């Protein structure tokens, strides 16, 4: 019996090949896109959950508000975690990590050549107790206990030794530092908020034994015992800070923590759950750029909406097609079929369609996965698509859609009286459906909203790239490993002016396109070092060529100059710092910092530089102080217009002559600037892709419905042509109702899209306006696409021979 049902179902689907193909392709596309987005969302939600202790690990994050300056960071004082573990038995273990992304480069000797590598961290010996990453070689309990030891990941072991059995071997690091390999750990999973390639003992870091409570220079993680109450633990953290920090506040600022709080300033440290870091933390000194929970919500909604569009299409076309089968139902009933037989037949056809769609959807997902990975910046493996849990959910959803789509014709058509059906009294009422029109409106509402979102994101990215940022990022080459060249870097810089294509060059510690990681230091307005005169400013360590090389403009005063030996003790402020300090004539003012003996040292202001963006445009320009330094981490070279490629080759040749085998590792500043908005650019690309798929699915459904409508009105079209109606008139007649539905969808989409994109733009301090023309443009694009889709079928119907259509009736 079932075999017979299956054979009849397949014959029926084959008989209407066009509808069958549209139905399968539409639903498969929706399911395939939904599957890809589901993989993305699941990956984002799984961060750090590979750690079996993840739900018991917290990071201690700083929130410091001092004299109208807020400082949020993923760092804390070095003694905090140690003190908590000593004083609070609920803290089972702790680890402190020193890692700054823009300072994590490391030079390693391989063969006789120096190799530039990345992601070197310093950590306590308890690292592998808090983060139990499997070791392929070595003892996790002792691997980081000895000074000058190093633990490396599997990839690094194979890169430098072609093996993972390397415990006891030596790596030579820049500065004649020999490190003994004491462990090799598996590559850290992609869904982790850090990906260190090398880990050295914390005591080997540049901090030494800095145990000041006012220095936030490590990321501190604590592992608590099962059942620990988070609120009680937070109170313990607050009490510890008040006790120990108070002593240093009185020594340095001559104020107690209580008095400081009464003035509105505070030092707070929050417990950030490990599993929340990736999606809920966006602080200074994050190990890596984190995700955004709002994007997870947005993409989840888009996946649901695209799937709904596909399902609506599927059900729309299934019910429309079934209207032509009313007479078939009547004949089957006359021939002896029961209502149950008919219900089973219709449901089986619908389920077959949906299951075929699922198989095609998996193929679509596999084909699009490399493209999706490129657009989203993910590295989702092919095998993730075949996750049993995910496929079971999709299978269940597919069966549900098939049952819903088949239920209307199954239960409605099977209830018809044969005599009425065969007389044709039900066809007219069945063919017109307000529900079908509503579903078309819904489909194009989503499509138009996505088009508007895509245009707004594109406009904001254009605004970012065209807005004046206070420096000239064009034709600036940055060498990021200048420190590694040692003393050779100065000789290299002296030789740069001899290259005809070089305009200027600067050695500095910080670049405005590095995206964060700047030092935040306390400065005082008066020699009386106290809390009231304290300002927290961003310190940029520069030389006298920094401002001209980067094309910055002076607002007052002058730049640093070798003609003034006293400039080594001078400072340059930006306009925001002057405004914060409230100075009318800053060139007559001084700022102070304590020297080694805690006596105030004066730094006269010699100039004011115009404000420039030294972080992304999500953030407001903050107060900056520039000081002269011998820092050699970054070398920026401004190139003259002309043959850039030839000039870079000359610079590289000179670099090799002075850099003692250190590789020539460079980027261009405009590329670094673009990386600051990589996440927004990816979002824009994904929105374009989603909008294209949404429109494609909607148009497939529209094409099917127009085809159905023209089939229903074949006789009417023939009569109109016999009576002299023009082709254009008939096309307009057939398209008018559907065009009206698209316009209704546009009217609904406009306010919703405006609200959603306004909320998104609020995440930028500097943002574009939503232009009014975006809305009619999006509506016109959707209408044009819909008209092209409809015209293909309506013109064919209008050009058909009326004799043939009337004879068939």
Positions of PLM-derived features:
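Alpha-helical transmembrane segments of integral membrane proteins
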Residues: 1-24, 285-288, 318-355, 366-486, ...
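Membrane-helix entry/capping segments
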Residues: 1-11, 15-19, 51, 243-302, ...
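Hydrophobic alpha-helical transmembrane segments of multi-pass inner-membrane transport and secretion
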Residues: 15-41, 291-327, 355, 435-458, ...
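Membrane-proximal juxtamembrane linkers immediately C-terminal to transmembrane helices
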Residues: 35, 39-63, 89, 134, ...
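Hydrophobic, regular-secondary-structure patches
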Residues: 44, 58-119, 126, 158-163, ...
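Mid-to-C-terminal secondary-structure elements
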Residues: 124-137, 148-291, 491-679
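Hydrophobic alpha-helical transmembrane segments of polytopic membrane proteins
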Residues: 390-409, 448, 693, 699, ...
């Amino acid at each position: 019996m079932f075999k017979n049902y299956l054979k009849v179902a397949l014959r029926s689907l084959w008989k209407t090949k066009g509808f069958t193909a549209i139905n399968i392709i539409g639903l498969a596309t929706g399911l395939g896109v939904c599957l890809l987005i589901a993989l993305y969302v699941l990956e984002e939600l799984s961060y750090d959950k590979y750690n079996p202790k993840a739900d018991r690990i917290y990071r201690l994050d700083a929130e410091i508000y001092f004299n109208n300056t807020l400082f949020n960071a993923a760092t804390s004082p070095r003694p905090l975690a140690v003190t908590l573990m000593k004083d609070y038995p609920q803290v089972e273990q702790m680890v402190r990590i020193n890692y700054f992304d823009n300072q994590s480069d490391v030079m390693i000797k391989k063969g006789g050549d120096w190799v530039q590598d990345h992601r070197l961290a310093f950590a306590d010996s308890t690292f592998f107790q808090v983060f139990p990453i499997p070791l392929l070689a070595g003892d996790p309990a002792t691997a980081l206990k000895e000074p000058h030891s190093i633990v490396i990941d599997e990839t690094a072991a194979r890169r430098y030794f072609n093996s993972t059995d390397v415990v006891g071997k030596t790596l030579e690091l820049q500065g004649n530092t020999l490190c003994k390999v004491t462990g090799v750990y598996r590559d850290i999973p992609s869904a982790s908020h850090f990906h260190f390639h090398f880990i050295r003992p914390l005591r080997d870091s540049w901090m030494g034994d800095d145990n000041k409570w006012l220095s936030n220079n490590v990321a501190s993680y604590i592992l608590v015992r099962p059942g620990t109450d988070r609120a009680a633990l937070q109170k313990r953290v607050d009490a510890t800070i008040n006790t120990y920090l108070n002593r240093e506040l009185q020594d340095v600022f001559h104020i107690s923590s209580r008095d400081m709080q009464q003035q509105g300033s505070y030092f707070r440290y929050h417990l950030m759950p490990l599993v929340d870091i990736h999606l809920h933390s966006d602080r200074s000194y994050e190990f890596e750029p984190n995700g955004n929970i709002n994007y997870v919500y947005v993409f989840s909604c888009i996946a649901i909406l695209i799937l709904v569009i596909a399902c609506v299409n599927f059900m729309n076309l299934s019910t429309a097609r079934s209207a032509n089968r009313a007479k078939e139902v009547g004949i089957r009933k006359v021939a002896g079929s029961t209502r149950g037989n008919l219900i089973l037949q219709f449901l089986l056809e619908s389920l077959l369609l949906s299951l075929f769609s699922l198989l095609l959807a998996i193929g679509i997902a596999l084909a699009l996965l490399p493209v999706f990975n490129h657009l989203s910046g993910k590295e989702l493996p092919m095998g993730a698509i075949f996750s049993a849990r995910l496929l079971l959910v999709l299978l269940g959803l597919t069966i549900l859609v098939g049952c819903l789509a088949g239920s209307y014709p199954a239960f409605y058509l099977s209830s018809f009286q044969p005599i009425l059906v065969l007389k044709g009294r039900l066809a007219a009422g069945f063919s017109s459906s307000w529900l079908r029109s509503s579903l078309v409106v819904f489909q194009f509402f989503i499509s138009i909203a996505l088009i508007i979102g895509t245009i707004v994101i594109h406009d904001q990215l254009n605004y970012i790239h065209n807005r004046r940022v206070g420096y000239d990022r064009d034709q600036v080459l940055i060498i990021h490993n200048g420190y590694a060249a040692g003393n050779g870097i100065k000789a290299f810089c002296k030789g740069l002016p001899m290259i005809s294509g070089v305009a200027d060059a600067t050695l500095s510690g910080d670049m405005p396109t590095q995206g964060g990681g700047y030092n935040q230091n306390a400065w005082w307005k008066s020699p009386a070092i106290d809390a009231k005169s304290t300002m927290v400013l961003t310190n940029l360590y520069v030389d006298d060529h920094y401002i001209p090389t980067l094309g910055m403009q002076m607002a007052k005063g002058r730049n640093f100059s070798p003609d003034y030996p006293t400039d080594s003790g001078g400072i340059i402020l930006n306009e925001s710092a002057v405004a914060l300090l409230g100075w009318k004539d800053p060139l007559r003012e001084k700022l102070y910092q304590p020297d080694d003996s805690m006596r105030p040292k004066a730094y006269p202001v010699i100039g004011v530089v115009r404000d420039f963006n030294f972080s992304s445009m999500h953030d407001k320009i903050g107060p900056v102080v520039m000081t002269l330094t011998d820092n050699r981490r970054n070398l920026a070279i401004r190139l003259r217009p002309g043959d850039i490629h030839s000039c870079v080759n000359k610079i590289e040749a000179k670099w090799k002559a002075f850099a003692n085998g250190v590789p020539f590792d460079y980027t261009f500043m405009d590329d670094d600037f673009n990386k600051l908005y990589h996440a927004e650019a990816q979002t824009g690309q994904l929105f374009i892709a989603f909008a294209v798929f949404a429109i494609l699915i909607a148009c497939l459904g529209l094409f099917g419905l127009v085809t159905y409508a023209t089939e229903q009105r074949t006789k009417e079209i023939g009569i109109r042509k016999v009576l002299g109606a023009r082709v254009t008139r008939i096309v307009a007649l057939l398209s008018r109702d559907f065009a009206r539905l698209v316009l209704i969808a546009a009217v609904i989409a406009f306010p919703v899209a405006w609200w959603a994109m306004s909320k998104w733009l609020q995440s930028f301090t500097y943002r574009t306006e939503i232009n009014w023309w975006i809305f009619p443009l999006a509506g016109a694009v959707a209408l044009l696409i819909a008209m092209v889709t409809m015209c293909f079928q309506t013109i064919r119907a209008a050009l058909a021979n009326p004799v043939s259509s009337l004879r068939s009736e």
